A protein has these predicted regions:
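Short aromatic-cysteine micro-motif
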Residues: 57-58, 86-288
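GGW-centered surface loops in extracellular recognition modules
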Residues: 16-74
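Active-site-proximal beta-strands of protease catalytic cores
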Residues: 290-299
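Conserved "repeat-terminator" motif of extracellular CCP/Sushi domains
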Residues: 1-16
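Disulfide-stabilized, aromatic/cysteine-rich ligand-recognition loop
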Residues: 20, 178-192, 197, 201, ...
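Acidic glycine-/aspartate-rich tracts in secreted/extracellular proteins
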Residues: 13-14, 67-71, 146-149, 298-304, ...
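Short, solvent-exposed loop/turn elements at domain surfaces
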Residues: 70-78, 149-155, 318-321
Length: 346
């Protein structure tokens, strides 16, 4: 029952144990969110509205439910304990079937390539860690916001020099852009907590978010055909009232970041926003999945010249051209104002 309020308890208790009315019970047999060491639950958040946790510095993550049921795992089943190679294959195949409508067939795969910021063994082990955690716990955490920078905006980047700005997952930060896919993975991996792993999302995780949002009321059409109403796109008109937000007005040589609410957007235009600028762009407690900056994943396009994948569209695209589920391709050296990333925790 995802309507219950969950009060998470810290490790080493079992994931999903909660305290309700003085009694301890399991939050759900299908999804068992855990509280990594050093994290606290954000007050007022539940499985119904987007269960959110934050670390000691205020970085926030939202729980994405992936129900541990026979419907989701018809081949793998619900009793895996050894996690053999064949069992990992079955888990992944079942998750692909569960999210099939968002996968774009089998063109894009969670397979290793040399520009992803990991070795082949690291990639394989990371994927196994993710699959095991999702299977055992019935979900995973994803950054509530696109990864950002508090100190100031990036204005350039180099594919040969690692960025030094400290990444945060907080509202009203400058988007952490001008990063390659491999640089984004390096940055994401350093945000881990205790026994849990932080990383860019694998493609199946992005697809699982789409399926999760579908179970919470979004239509497949809104997710895979036209996401204009839910994101900062070129063709989305809106009224930003968040006075702590910032916006980048792209206008030739006069382009610059401006602090304060943008106000009313009355015509199609290119406006990059700070993270979490408007609740209009929030679904289940997760901001800016649609538009703003495109987000690197660990997927592989199978194209040697453009092997990298970014998803969710960006502020210079139309919401019916680059909906939330959309795959876009990039080179290993691609880095610009429109590419950013989001961290997952598992």
């Amino acid at each position: 029952n995802s309507d219950i309020e969950v009060t998470l308890t810290a490790e080493p208790k079992q994931p999903g144990e909660e305290t309700n009315g003085g009694s301890t019970s399991v939050s759900s047999n299908e999804t068992r969110p855990y509280l990594p060491t050093g994290f606290t639950q954000v007050k007022g958040t539940t499985l119904k509205n987007g269960l959110t946790i934050q670390d000691s510095t205020g970085n926030q993550y939202v729980w994405v439910e992936v129900p541990k049921t026979g419907k989701v795992y018809p081949t793998a089943g619900l009793n895996i304990t050894e996690f053999t190679t064949d069992e990992y294959t079955a888990i992944e195949a079942d998750l692909h079937t569960y999210t099939d409508v968002y996968r774009d067939g089998t063109i894009y795969k969670d397979e290793y390539y040399s520009g992803v910021g990991l070795t082949s063994d690291e990639y394989t082990n990371l994927k196994k860690t993710m699959l095991k955690s999702v299977y055992q716990n019935g979900g995973f955490y994803v950054g509530k916001y696109e990864t950002g920078i508090e100190s100031g905006p990036k204005t350039s980047g180099s594919s040969s020099t690692e960025p030094t700005e400290i990444p945060v997952i907080k509202q009203n930060a400058y988007p952490y852009n001008y990063v390659t896919c491999s640089q984004a993975q390096t940055l994401a991996s350093k945000m881990k907590s205790g026994n849990y792993t932080s990383s860019l999302m694998f493609g199946v995780q992005w697809d699982l978010i789409m399926k999760y949002l579908e179970t919470k009321g979004m239509s497949q059409k809104e997710l895979k055909e036209n996401s204009t109403n839910f994101g900062n796109y070129y063709n989305k008109l809106y009224n930003i009232t968040n006075i702590e937000s910032k916006y980048y007005f792209s206008h030739g040589s006069g382009s610059k970041w401006i602090s304060g609410a943008y106000g009313t957007k009355i015509s199609n235009s290119f406006i990059l926003l700070s993270t979490g600028a408007s609740d209009d762009f929030c679904k289940q407690g997760i901001y800016d999945l649609a538009g703003n900056v495109a987000e690197w994943t660990l997927e592989y396009t199978s194209e040697s010249s453009d092997p990298c994948v970014k998803r969710g569209g960006c502020y210079s695209a139309a919401g019916n051209g680059e909906p939330i589920a959309k795959h876009n391709i990039g080179q290993t050296s691609t880095k610009s104002i429109v590419e950013g990333f989001r961290v997952s925790l598992f």
